[in-house]
Amino acid sequence: MDFAFTDEQRMIQETAQAFFTENATSERTRAAMAGDGMDARLWTDFCQELGLAGVALPEDIGGVGLGMVELAIIAEAAGAQVSAIPMLGHVMVTQALAAGGSDAQRERWIAALTGGEAIAAAALEDDVAATGDTLSGTVRFVPHGALAHVLLIANGEGAWLVEAGAEGVAITAHTTMDQTRPMATVKLSNVASDPLPHPAAAIAAARAGGMIVLSAEALGGAQETLDRTVSYAKDRVQFGRAIGSFQAYKHRLADMMIEIEQARSAVYWAACAVDEGTEEA
């Protein structure tokens, strides 16, 4: 596999980095954390102005027609700024629709989701019981569950779409350590659902997309942490010298850089594997 970015990928990287650096400021992130955990304006601008919310979706269903590598590039840029946006659930649900949804389901949700008009969350839990297409059960720790308009429910045997406002759906928001990714408990009591016709493909695609987003966001955060630490080491003076000049400090920074580069290789290798459909994916 060739890990060198193409010109198009570099352009996406530069665009995403500039967008999140300018808009996902610490002040806006703190404001989101003090509220419901989401920067709604940032998400709307990302979807509508940047137009990359459907980057890894096929063009024939309303996407950009690129792949997981491009998605990872964007998620890395978002993670670098600790962006308070519902990208994880969005990617999991849209990937599930692309891989295992019906034409009607895609028509109902893809445009609304990629346009920022609706928010999605994924609840994958084996304890959810299905009687036909009626669902019951409780799923805990659903990212952005309390903000979602549509939920992807999957229990390993089937996958269903449930509208958050449907009868029998009770969602309780929780305060967690990472306030930029608020969690919720979703309780289903005899809830009518819309089954995806190809659940195995949908679940596999949702999990793959979710893991790419999570790992790329973490990579972006790690790289930004290192960059800021290096910058601080050049400015902070102790014993008459910049602390970055001390050998022990240099060694720690070098170790961190090596670990981040190893993580970067793993993230983009995984993204390439998904795009190419290899067995390792």
Language-model-detected regions and their locations in the chain:
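Alpha-helical interface subdomain recognition
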Residues: 1-81, 103-104, 116, 205-281
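Structured catalytic cores of enzymes that bind and process phosphorylated ligands/cofactors
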Residues: 9, 17, 90, 94-95, ...
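Short, solvent-exposed polar/charged micro-motifs at secondary-structure junctions
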Residues: 39-41, 99, 129-133
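Conserved protein kinase catalytic domain
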Residues: 47, 72-75, 94-97, 110, ...
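Short beta-strands and strand-loop turn motifs
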Residues: 54-57, 88-91, 121
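FAD-binding core of flavoproteins
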Residues: 66, 83-86, 95, 104-227, ...
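Extended, compositionally biased flexible segments
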Residues: 74, 87-88
